[in-house]
Amino acid sequence: MNEWRTVSLVDSTALTVIISVAVFTSAVALLGVVKKRSRWRVLGALISSAVLTSGAWVVIEKLWKPFPDPNPWTIYLSAGLAVFPLLSILFRTGRTRILMATLTVIALVNTAAVINVIYQPYPTLGSFNPVPTAVSMSYADFESQTTAPTMDDREVGALVQVPLAGTTDDSTSGFDARDAYAYIPPAYWDNPSLQLPVLVLMPGNPGQPDQWFSSGNADQTADNFQATHDGISPIVISVDGTGSFSGNPACVDSDAQSVMTYLSHDVPMLIKQKFRVNQDQRTWTIGGLSYGGTCALQIMTNHPEAYGSFLDFSGQEEPTLGTRQQTVDQLFGGDEDAFKAVNPEDLLNQAISSGAHTYSGISGRFIAGSNDKSAVSALSHLDNLSNQAGMSTTFDTVAGGHSFQVWRVALANTFDWVAKRGGLQV
């Protein structure tokens, strides 16, 4: 009955369907070439779509650079194949325009499917409507909750949407963060004397805090753990590290935003205010994917007192707005030394050369997709530096690229370690 839920949207069959749809829509849109009276209209639409797509690539990848990682060329190709029938509407008349409009809708859906194959937020049809493993609630509802939530005759955790902006009177950063999402295990109610450790997670860029639960399966991972540990699990809180879906503040304190102060000072303070947690932040872990992974290492190297451990999944070698020079110019007023003063690689090298014990007691896990060559290179290098600087870290790869295929597995593989670092029995 539920076989449809397991239908893959990212396997070879799905890829074959995507390619077939792309060929079909393009071929139909090109049919007008064989007719002399419409040939130039079709060619005009084709050339215009190529120019617009190329222009979009230049703006996004070379000029604007809103994302720290380049987008795969296949995204631009699939988008261009959608723009072609869209522009054809302007060059056609009558019923042909209706056909082109239909092809445009199909091609746009196909482009979304291409993006999904690359980043895999929705690996199956069922992932669009996942089976809940925790009871979703507002923070107000959470405050009035006196017993562990139940589902299907068993105790489960709560998935709480919680305001966590750094704009309160006792906050320091002034960072207007989006709402965080927190998984609270059943033991929070069943055993109030427990001092549960915290795992703070950050999404990538583009991204939003709830992605760690909607696509990263963080609630499923935590539920699997608590189900075999008497309802006990680390509290998992996914927080905002960018300020907007496509924002890229590079996880630093700048004239525009104080993101590093928010994550190192305000987030722990606000979590302690809103939840009953282990007060010793050395039992806490901060982590993230892509931009979030880069940010986690930035926090640990700049503020080693804020957390005891970190997870860097598919992070970059350094915080970036595209190039080193662009980053220095836009965020540090052109001051290279100011950039180096907060850059993890430089801070680790300083600790190595000075022999300082700044990072003693800190542990971390670097994980990259085996096909994500830039992340493999960056994280293996940073792992080596981290160990030389006095941390205890490891580097590993899992099958996949720069996608949720990797990040779901990475979190599941490290969750026991996070719990153990937090003082829980594993």
UniProtKB/Swiss-Prot annotation:
GO terms for molecular function: acyltransferase activity, transferring groups other than amino-acyl groups. This is Uncharacterized protein Cgl0967/cg1104. Signal peptide: none annotated. InterPro entries: AB_hydrolase_fold, Esterase-like, Mycobacterial_A85_antigen. It comes from the Bacteria. PANTHER family: DIACYLGLYCEROL ACYLTRANSFERASE_MYCOLYLTRANSFERASE AG85A, ENTEROCHELIN ESTERASE-RELATED. Pfam families: Esterase.
